[in-house]
Amino acid sequence: MAVFKTTLWWLISGTLGIICLSLTATLGILLKNSFTKLSIEPAFTPGPDIELQKDSDCCSCQEKWVGYRCNCYFISSEQKTWNESRHLCASQKSSLLQLQNTDELDFMSSSQQFYWIGLSYSEEHTAWLWENGSALSQYLFPLFETFNPKNCIAYNPNGNALDESCEDKNRYICKQQLI
């Protein structure tokens, strides 16, 4: 009878131990996920080739937008002309992407798509300008002198840029700066 009580006690304590370990692991996973503030909704579907990385803790983006390095990005899955893209971004209180540096879109580095960005040629200033009127830094696109001034710029997150007719249809990236 004593052997039976000891075996039963070991069985019960072993089962309770496994339950405690499972609950601890689940709690750890839930806590880790609650501190990650990557705001992306399943309905967004930026495409199978976009790989998201952790967001910094300084931003919260609206539904269907991706938060990364204190900015919010909308990565379209539909194709529009450059002007249509610009107007759609403006309607969301944002602008077509203005790149600050070549690392800005690291979270999309596996994408092969080209997207309209907010860079176009100003005949008035005879220069490539961002939507906000600032000049293009030469280090971003070293070969920008070869771009056709009658075109707009489509950008690939791998760092490639193409000049294409502004009437062509491409996907686009809107950017909202939070800070």
Curated annotation (Swiss-Prot):
It comes from the Eukaryota. Residues 68-175 form the C-type lectin domain. Keywords: Adaptive immunity, Cell membrane, Disulfide bond, Glycoprotein, Immunity, Innate immunity, Lectin, Membrane, Receptor, Signal-anchor, Transmembrane, Transmembrane helix. Pfam families: Lectin_C. InterPro entries: C-type_lectin-like, C-type_lectin-like/link_sf, CTDL_fold, NKG2/CD94_NK_receptors, NKR-like_CTLD. Glycans are attached at N83, N132. It is found in: Cell membrane. The lineage of its organism: Eukaryota, Metazoa, Chordata, Craniata, Vertebrata. One of its GO terms (biological process) is innate immune response. One of its GO terms (molecular function) is carbohydrate binding. SUPFAM superfamilies: C-type lectin-like. It comes from Pongo pygmaeus. CDD domains: CLECT_NK_receptors_like. GO terms for cellular component: plasma membrane. This is Natural killer cells antigen CD94.
